[in-house]
Amino acid sequence: MAETPFHIPVLVNECLSWFSDRNPRSFCDVTVGAGGHAEAFLSTYPSIISYDGSDRDATALSLARERLEKFGDRVHLHHASFEDLAQDPKENVYDGILADLGVSSMQLDTLSRGFSFQGEDHDLDMRMDTSQGITASEVLNTLREEELGKIFREYGEEPHWKNVANAIVHFRRRKKIITVKDLKEATARVFPSYRLRKKIHPLTLIFQALRVYVNQEDVQLKVLLESAMRWLAPKGRLVIISFCSSEDRPVKWFFREAEKSGLGKILTKKVVMPTYEEIRRNPRCRSAKLRCFEKTS
């Protein structure tokens, strides 16, 4: 597959609709990526005079900078993780905050990043921010079998987590797991035949688990949710798009607890999902789930 810096933003109209009854002035996009959602918001809502966009991926951020240049000083872009952003003491600032979690199509299709199991000869990197942190390859070659199993079980919800961890540890005794091809070889005999016959690649959940662990996505998400309540202005809305249960479940739980505590109300009593038409155009969005929360004070 040819490498291409292309990303299709998900649930764009649904994101926009949560602000159609107001004229947002300040907005924060903590996963600005290549700028797809940002472009839609800035075009749809001329009332936005300050759009703060951030991302851990410097490559994506450079694309966003080009794409959003036409909006001039309405846009402010930052290379930052959720934890970096949490250091800012701002309060009651934003009318809206958007987080599009997980990995983007652009990151998947850039095979050298190691996010996709289609990149046979590429290194297993998987870092959102390639300037820091450990790679997926380092994780696979250094962690104990019990630790690997826990990652696959908790972050990937892989039914065969124990067998996968065992196979990896046995394989790396004779050869380091560096590339996607190495990981495929290491786990070649692990999955039952029915998993091999499915359209979804058997390593999908393992790749998901490694990505979440490498990027500390669970920790980052917790920090974001807590910080967002502080950043939002009264009546401000937080929109979060997730792609797997390990992302959606903490969001769902946090919103429920925040509502019980009187911080605001859940606007999505039923989770919002892509339409059939959007899934037809962009099959990768099929697992997307959108939730929205409004702060009261």
Curated annotation (Swiss-Prot):
Pfam families the record matches: Methyltransf_5
Subcellular location, record wording: Cytoplasm
Binding site for S-adenosyl-L-methionine: G35, G36, H37, D55, F82, D100, Q107
Keyword Methyltransferase carried by entry: yes
EC number: 2.1.1.199
GO cellular component, one term: cytoplasm
Keywords per UniProt: Cytoplasm, Methyltransferase, rRNA processing, S-adenosyl-L-methionine, Transferase
Main location: cytoplasm
Family statement: Belongs to the methyltransferase superfamily. RsmH family.
PANTHER family: 12S RRNA N4-METHYLCYTIDINE METHYLTRANSFERASE, S-ADENOSYL-METHYLTRANSFERASE MRAW
Name of the protein described by the UniProt record: Ribosomal RNA small subunit methyltransferase H
Source organism: Chlamydia caviae (strain ATCC VR-813 / DSM 19441 / 03DC25 / GPIC)
UniProt gene name: rsmH
